[in-house]
C-alpha cells in the first residue's frame, strides 16, 4: 500500500479524487483519522496503490526537454519524445504515481491512458503525432501511440513519475 504525505490545502476528498478512490475507502484504510480531517505533513495510507519503493521502475519527465525517461532501478532504459501542456494549461510539476490505466480510451487520447495521482492528468497516446515535441496539450503528457503502448506494457500501477521543468 502507498503511504502518502498530505500537502498543504489538501482534503480527504481531494486526495480521494486524485487517487481515484473514495473518502470512505481512505477512512477505512486509516481508522485513526479524526472525523476525516487531515493536515499538511500527515501520512495516510492510500489503499489499492502499490508502494512505489517496491517497483523497480520510475519515470522522469523533463518539460523543457520534452522527454520522458524510463529507468529500471538507476539504469536508463529508454528516452521517449513527448508533448506537454501549453502556457495556459501547463503540465503540473511534482511527484506523482500511476494510479490506473485504460487501453483505447477514445477521443484524442490515442491508444492508451495512464492516470497520474492528480485528477484529470495522465500520460497518453495521441491521434496527432505531429504534436510530439511541442507544448500543445491541456496539461497531460502526450506520447506516440507505439511509445505509450510500450511504456504501459512495462510499468505497473504505483510507478513513480517525477515531472520537472
From Swiss-Prot:
Where is it predominantly found? other
InterPro entries xref list: LD-transpeptidase (IPR050979), LD_TPept_cat_dom (IPR005490), LysM_dom (IPR018392), LysM_dom_sf (IPR036779), Transpep_catalytic_dom (IPR038063)
The pathway noted for it is: Cell wall biogenesis; peptidoglycan biosynthesis
Question: Where would I find the L,D-TPase catalytic domain in this sequence?
Answer: 57-164
Report the SUPFAM superfamilies cross-referenced here: L,D-transpeptidase catalytic domain-like (SSF141523), LysM domain (SSF54106)
The GO biological-process annotations, alphabetized, read as: cell wall organization; peptidoglycan-protein cross-linking; regulation of cell shape; sporulation resulting in formation of a cellular spore
Provide the GO MF annotations for this entry: glycosyltransferase activity; peptidoglycan L,D-transpeptidase activity
Kindly state which keywords UniProt assigns to this record, in alphabetical order. Answer: Cell shape, Cell wall biogenesis/degradation, Glycosyltransferase, Hydrolase, Peptidoglycan synthesis, Sporulation, Transferase
Q: Does the keyword Cell wall biogenesis/degradation apply?
A: yes
Which segments constitute the LysM domain? 2-46
Stretches that traverse the bilayer: none
Catalytic residues identified in the record: 124 (proton donor/acceptor), 140 (nucleophile)
Q: Which Gene3D superfamilies match?
A: L,D-transpeptidase catalytic domain-like (2.40.440.10), LysM domain (3.10.350.10)
Enzyme class comes to transferase
The subcellular location is: Spore wall
Which domain of life does this protein belong to? Answer: Bacteria
Disulfide bond residue pairs: none
- What do the Gene Ontology cellular component annotations say? extracellular region; spore wall
Q: How does it assemble?
A: Monomer.
Domain notes from UniProt:
LysM domains are thought to be involved in peptidoglycan binding.
Q: Which family does it belong to?
A: Belongs to the YkuD family.
- What does this chain do? Probable enzyme that may play an important role in cell wall biology.
- The name of this protein is Putative L,D-transpeptidase YkuD
- Organism name: Bacillus licheniformis (strain ATCC 14580 / DSM 13 / JCM 2505 / CCUG 7422 / NBRC 12200 / NCIMB 9375 / NCTC 10341 / NRRL NRS-1264 / Gibson 46)
